[in-house]
A protein has these predicted regions:
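Short, surface-exposed binding/anchoring microloops in extracellular/periplasmic proteins
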Residues: 2-42, 48
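Short, compact, well-ordered microdomains
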Residues: 73-123
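Acidic, aromatic-enriched beta-alpha/helix-loop junctions
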Residues: 36-86
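Generic N-terminal initiation segments characterized by hydrophobic and/or small/turn-forming residues
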Residues: 12, 34, 52, 101-104, ...
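Polar low-complexity intrinsically disordered regions
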Residues: 1-5, 9-10, 104, 120-123
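Intrinsically disordered, low-complexity segments enriched in small/polar residues
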Residues: 17, 22, 28, 41, ...
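Low-complexity, compositionally biased segments
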Residues: 29, 51, 56-57, 61, ...
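Proline-rich intrinsically disordered, low-complexity coils
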Residues: 2, 60, 71, 108-109
Length: 123
């Protein structure tokens, strides 16, 4: 089981290498609408919320990774996201299949993360 320090170390390594990390996503009918992601800019991790189309158009050469936490928290790791073209859309998956539905693991909704951020800013 990875602890917070090792997750942060893995994240730093990926971000400094110019990869992107997805930490939340809004999904409707098996299709991602928007994601919360982190990237490296000017010596620090930067968070942004973008649409799926924005991510498709700006897919980094170093890849995109999903923060995966198994039920109960036994496994915490980053899994590389594969992007492929389906009949009607581009799809993102971490399981190696080409099923025409997005699957980034058990990420929370973006709205949940926005709420957490808003609560943390209360004064």
């Amino acid at each position: 089981m990875a602890d917070v320090k090792s997750i942060v170390a893995q994240a730093r390594k990926l971000l400094v290498a110019e990869a992107v990390i997805v930490t939340a996503c809004d999904v409707r009918d098996g299709v991602i609408e928007r994601v919360q992601l982190y990237f490296w800019s000017e010596g620090q991790a930067v968070m942004d919320i973008v649409t799926k189309d924005d991510l498709v158009q700006n897919w980094p050469d170093q890849g995109v990774y999903s923060l995966v936490v198994s039920p109960g928290g036994a496994e915490k790791s980053f899994k590389k996201i594969a992007m492929f073209e389906g009949e009607e859309d581009m799809y993102f998956r971490i399981d190696g299949t080409r099923t025409e539905a997005d699957d980034l693991g058990s990420l929370p909704p973006v709205a949940f993360m926005e709420s957490v951020e808003a609560v943390s800013q209360l004064r």
